[in-house]
């Protein structure tokens, strides 16, 4: 079967032939339809994030996938059913977090991540997965179901942010998304659909005309160019906001977000910055702001099957035009390299292995 890999000797993604995997009892053989490409994939390719499977020189890429059950073995699934796989698996014996169905809360070193760190991903004609790591999707999501994974990540982060404010009567009506990549835009759409979020902002570094700005404004949000209005200046230029959702991986944004918050606001951090960057921050001022204004900062990574199910519902409810606008390129395996190229008008790309 076809598979897209990187190797220790060659970090350039390439198409190779691999044997089709055989499912074991309790696992499912899935025929892959589409696999998305995101910033994490580029970090894996560059060697700045993740790692290879134990005793292997190659890693099959891809962690955002949708496929069709080819062989359900003895599981609850049926042949032909549409499914999306979660990403984390135990490294050795499962920890209590895995036993509770919360692999997203497992400690580093206790898990591998398909297509990212220590385990082959889903960019292949077929893959196998334990049944409990698969989520059934409606047939209506056959084209865009690979977005379930990134939407699930947004669902978890928003859930954590709301939970941090659940001890009191919090009534947020404004939010700021940092980052106008695909994850930021999908999150903006989720927030736009909430009844309590009346004012939305999205920060980026693109100049008009630009398709991401078009999407932002079509969702009813205000675009902020960080080159003219840095995050810390947003309260003066616009307003302090109740929620900040950081999806840039720019380390200073973690601290600037505190300044952007209104009293009792919360910032959710998702971006993972490169290690080793040091800079000065006004520590006592930030500390005072957090305490005296009841602000909170939460970190969030990965997601679990419950978030995937919520993401499937969210995707099905998004405006029909949105996914078509965000997914700017779907490439078959003969032209898979195009999915890894960033263009001025590209937002989200995917590799297509098969059709429904």
UniProtKB/Swiss-Prot annotation:
Binding locations of NADP(+): 180-183, 205-206, 270-272, 300-302
UniProt: substrate binding residues: 40, 113, 149, 302
Alphabetized Gene3D superfamilies for the sequence: Medium-chain alcohol dehydrogenases, catalytic domain, NAD(P)-binding Rossmann-like Domain
Cofactors: Zn(2+)
EC id: 1.1.1.47
BP terms from Gene Ontology: non-phosphorylated glucose catabolic process
Function as written in the Swiss-Prot or TrEMBL entry: Catalyzes the NAD(P)(+)-dependent oxidation of D-glucose to D-gluconate via gluconolactone. Can utilize both NAD(+) and NADP(+) as electron acceptor. Is involved in the degradation of glucose through a modified Entner-Doudoroff pathway.
UniProtKB keywords: Carbohydrate metabolism, Metal-binding, NAD, NADP, Nucleotide-binding, Oxidoreductase, Zinc
Protein's name according to its UniProt entry: Glucose 1-dehydrogenase
Binding site for Zn(2+): 38, 63-64, 149
PANTHER family associated with the record: GLUCOSE 1-DEHYDROGENASE (PTHR43189:SF2), ZINC-TYPE ALCOHOL DEHYDROGENASE-LIKE PROTEIN C1198.01-RELATED (PTHR43189)
GO MF annotation terms: D-glucose binding; glucose 1-dehydrogenase (NAD+) activity; glucose 1-dehydrogenase (NADP+) activity; NAD+ binding; NADP+ binding; zinc ion binding
Family affiliation: Belongs to the zinc-containing alcohol dehydrogenase family. Glucose 1-dehydrogenase subfamily.
InterPro entries linked to this entry: ADH-like_N, Glc_1-DH_arc, Glu_dehyd_C, GroES-like_sf, NAD(P)-bd_dom_sf
Comp. bias (Basic and acidic residues): 8-21
Region feature (Disordered): 1-26, 86-107
Residue ranges the record marks as coiled coil: none
Catalytic reactions of this protein: D-glucose + NAD(+) = D-glucono-1,5-lactone + NADH + H(+); D-glucose + NADP(+) = D-glucono-1,5-lactone + NADPH + H(+)
HAMAP family: Glucose_DH (MF_02127)
Superkingdom as given in the UniProt entry: Archaea
């Amino acid at each position: 079967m076809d598979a897209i890999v990187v190797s220790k000797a060659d970090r350039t993604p390439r198409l190779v032939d691999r044997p089709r995997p055989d499912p074991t009892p309790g696992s499912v053989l899935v025929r892959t339809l589409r696999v998305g490409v995101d910033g994490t994939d580029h970090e894996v390719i560059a060697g700045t994030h993740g790692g290879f499977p134990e005793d292997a020189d190659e890693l099959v890429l891809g962690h955002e996938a949708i496929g069709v059950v080819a062989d359900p073995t003895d599981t609850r699934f049926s042949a032909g059913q549409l499914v999306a796989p979660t990403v984390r698996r135990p490294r050795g014996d499962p920890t209590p977090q895995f036993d509770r169905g919360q692999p997203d809360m497992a400690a580093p070193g206790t898990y591998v991540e398909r297509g990212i760190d220590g385990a082959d991903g889903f960019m292949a004609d077929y893959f196998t997965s334990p049944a409990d790591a698969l989520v059934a999707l409606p047939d209506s999501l056959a084209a865009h179901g690979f977005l379930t994974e990134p939407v699930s990540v947004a669902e978890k982060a928003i859930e954590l942010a709301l939970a941090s404010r659940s001890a009191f009567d919090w009534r947020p009506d404004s939010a700021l998304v940092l980052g106008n990549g695909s994850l930021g835009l999908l999150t903006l759409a989720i927030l736009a659909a909430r009844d309590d979020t009346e004012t939305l902002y999205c920060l980026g570094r693109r100049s008009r005309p630009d398709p991401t700005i078009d999407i932002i404004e079509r969702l009813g949000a205000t675009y902020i160019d960080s080159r003219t209005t840095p995050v810390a200046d947003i309260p003066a230029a616009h307003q302090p906001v109740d929620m900040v959702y950081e999806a840039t991986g720019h380390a200073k944004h973690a601290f600037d977000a505190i300044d952007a918050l209104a009293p009792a606001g919360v910032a959710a951090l998702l971006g993972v910055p490169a290690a080793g960057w040091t800079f000065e921050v006004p520590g006592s001022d930030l500390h005072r702001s957090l305490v005296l204004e009841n602000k909170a900062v939460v970190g969030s990574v990965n997601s679990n099957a419950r978030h995937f199910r919520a993401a499937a519902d969210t995707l099905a409810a998004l405006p029909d035009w949105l996914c078509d606008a965000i997914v700017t390129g779907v490439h078959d395996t003969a032209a898979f390299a195009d999915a890894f190229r960033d263009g001025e008008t590209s937002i989200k790309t995917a590799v297509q292995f098969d059709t429904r």
